[in-house]
């Protein structure tokens, strides 16, 4: 994170009282565990009932050197807004729960939210062997033990391939789904 070149991702950390002037703090998350040794990639945060913050992120682990396999898993850390501790049983969601044909290399960007029924849910981007994007859903009663629920939506329309950074929320009586599609093919003014 301290260079112009791609390298192991961290979660930066800054605070502000006015949203104009910012104070930079040490990184909130750094790649310092076996399951995230090659990067702590994007995710989301939620405030727990005890007031603590829970960060859910993608941990990257590479095996076999530069041209080996990459594993992407979903991990959590809990903190007070300044300091965060990674959960001792990370990763909380790994490739073993993926349906057959979905990629363990493209399984990232968890978005966590609490539903009206009090259950925590998250959506995670993935894709299959044919590079068709999927958004997977998981549920948890406590944010620490997660259960695979199914595929929320599948990209059968050719709207990019891998769907990254999904968001799923309720707004004005409707569920809204957002994502960042990778590898969009040019079509008219869309690229």
Stretch-by-stretch model annotation:
Residues 1-109, 113-163, 170-191:
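Beta-rich carbohydrate-recognition and catalytic domains
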